[in-house]
């Protein structure tokens, strides 16, 4: 659906369902999504965070456009850069992720970034991709929304079919990382799928009904 209140309700219900399945979760973080999911002055993510916290009584924080997060365990540390927004690569989407990774390395080497990320997490392109280079793991998240037939999406119809699901990232006692994606089968929109049953055939030189 492209109806914003329905999208907010669905996202809230999905997060709450996951929290009930994993009751040990102590905090939830939500980042800003694409602008067409937003209302001016009231980001959808901020509203979702408020609803989740009210419903589940668990600390839920709206993080805005991006965040740097540092994980620490004993003598080990991992730094994550997280943002919904991502550069595109329609035909070869892996190349966009690789360029992003190289851009972080270049900016860090030129001292334009004070931190070298260990993990880069992005979304927006609606498909799961995982790349590991130069001791950096780059993860592009799948989507929770089925195909939306707006003009640009229809032009790139075979390329913009989304992966529906999520990613669970596991860290061991040394903060070594494993990204475990889970996806669900896509579906055909029943309103756009027309099944024609053959009722006519050619008999001799005449078109006759079979």
What function would you assign to each model-found segment?
Residues 51, 55-56, 63-67, 96-109:
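Active-site glycine-rich loop that binds ribose-phosphate moieties when present
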Residues 171-210:
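A short C-terminal boundary segment appended to hydrolase-like catalytic domains
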Residues 66-75, 132-133:
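Short acidic-hydrophobic surface loop/beta-edge motif
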Residues 60-64, 160-163:
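A short catalytic or substrate-binding loop motif that flags glycine-/basic-rich loops and adjacent residues
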Residues 1-61:
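Core catalytic region of metal-dependent phosphoesterases/phosphodiesterases
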Residues 37-55, 136-144, 199-205:
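Short, electropositive alpha-helical surface patch
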Residues 77-81, 86-180:
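Conserved beta-sheet core of the metallophosphoesterase superfamily
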Residues 24-28, 65-67, 78-79:
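Generic beta-strand structural signal
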